[in-house]
């Protein structure tokens, strides 16, 4: 006979007390992902436009990036985070709006870096779209 399933107790997230961190904004043509880490690179919170309920081409809009950045920022501020360095990667539409949303949540932004990878004539690019 099968044993009754033990009541799975929800694991309480321990509240870390981290005052400064790094916000990694990855803005692609299809989505915008925001990950907030501590100085060592350990993830504190993350969010994306798709996680916020945007589907299809609406994920790539600046508004979707703003909502995702507000969500990730709110989660990180629960851990006591106050100051952020921002690293922006990619060519997407949500770069600036995600940055403004992080400021609106109440973070003090100390530096902004563009870490978009640029090839020194590496792989052959995709063919041009003809619309």
From Swiss-Prot:
Domain of life: Bacteria
One family name in Pfam for this protein: Ribosomal_S11
Keyword Ribonucleoprotein part of the UniProt annotation: yes
Signal peptide annotation: none
Gene Ontology BP term (one): translation
One Gene Ontology MF term: rRNA binding
InterPro entries cross-referenced by the UniProt entry: Ribosomal_uS11, Ribosomal_uS11_bac-type, Ribosomal_uS11_CS, Ribosomal_uS11_sf
Keywords: Ribonucleoprotein, Ribosomal protein, RNA-binding, rRNA-binding
PROSITE patterns: RIBOSOMAL_S11 (PS00054)
One GO CC term on file: ribonucleoprotein complex
Protein purpose: Located on the platform of the 30S subunit, it bridges several disparate RNA helices of the 16S rRNA. Forms part of the Shine-Dalgarno cleft in the 70S ribosome.
Family per record: Belongs to the universal ribosomal protein uS11 family.
Self-association state and partner proteins as the record states: Part of the 30S ribosomal subunit. Interacts with proteins S7 and S18. Binds to IF-3.
PANTHER family given in the database record: 40S RIBOSOMAL PROTEIN S14/30S RIBOSOMAL PROTEIN S11
Protein name as it appears in the record: Small ribosomal subunit protein uS11
Originating species: Paramagnetospirillum magneticum (strain ATCC 700264 / AMB-1) (Magnetospirillum magneticum)
């Amino acid at each position: 006979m099968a044993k009754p399933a033990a009541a799975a107790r929800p694991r309480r997230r321990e509240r870390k007390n981290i005052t400064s961190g790094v916000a990694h904004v990855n803005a692609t043509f299809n989505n915008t992902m925001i990950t907030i880490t501590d100085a060592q690179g350990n993830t504190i919170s993350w969010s994306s436009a798709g996680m916020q309920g945007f589907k299809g081409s609406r994920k790539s809009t600046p508004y979707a990036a703003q909502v995702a950045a507000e969500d990730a920022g709110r989660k990180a501020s629960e851990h006591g985070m106050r100051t952020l360095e921002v690293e922006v990667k990619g060519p997407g539409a949500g770069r600036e709006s995600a940055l403004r949303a992080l400021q609106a949540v109440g973070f003090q932004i100390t530096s902004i870096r563009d870490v978009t990878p640029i090839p020194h004539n590496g792989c052959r690019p995709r063919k041009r779209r003809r619309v």
